């Protein structure tokens, strides 16, 4: 029996059916991106910039572009996918890698809703996937700090939907529908003291209290811990996590229901490794729980 999958299934069922909502935090403040921030975690480089409003634009592929699948060589099985090259225009955000810490600012690429992301360290050069499978795909790209926190300016997030070989209608963000993007945690994370960064991006609706028109609430559940509801997009530090695998679910809700759309609900897992991970900064306290 796959325990992780079973746990995820239970978490999704709990979140979708709904628990009582308790809103936490004030209305989100419209603040500028901090300039040259110090890393909140030892072992990671400090941030640089930005030098102005961060803007990111996907130049290729074009929206709704149909990328042909190359024919297979004679005697070989049919080709199942095609190379896809990404090109972007990025302004006012420096990408770099620090030699001492082997960390730095870069872009992250997310294809559809898979669990892994792909770091893009030099946005002046194209990024090519050797083969994406046939069908419709949505790629999301955004800049991150060395410690994994995303830049949250609206113009710093870019999304494009295209097709490889055929249009199957899957992995499509409907126009105007909210889009939830999980930045962290993903994969393996250091957690000697049990503190792990939870960071997300949301487009298509403001994350705020229900009194704000067209707003959404951000709800997450980790393992068997009480569900948490947030009304702002500040990063959250998950505390007291033991080494090993943890399952979690994050969703965008209105009136205690998941909002419609292909990218409004995410279920995944991450692994906390043994090793030092310093305490999170005091400015980012853990969110309050909503109860069992």
What do the PLM-derived regions correspond to, one by one?
Residues 144-152, 228, 254-261:
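Short acidic/polar inter-strand loop motif in beta-rich domains
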Residues 13-26:
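Bacterial N-terminal signal peptides
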Residues 115-123, 226-233:
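Short beta-strand segments within Ig-like beta-sandwich modules, predominantly Fibronectin type-III
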Residues 72, 80-86, 192-198:
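Structural beta-strand segments of beta-rich domains
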Residues 89-99, 201-210:
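Short amphipathic, basic-aromatic surface patches that mediate peripheral association
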Residues 129-136, 238-245:
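Surface-exposed, short loops/turns at beta-strand junctions within beta-sandwich domains
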Residues 34-79, 163-191, 289-292:
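Short, compositionally biased P/S/T/A/G/V-rich stretches that sit at domain boundaries
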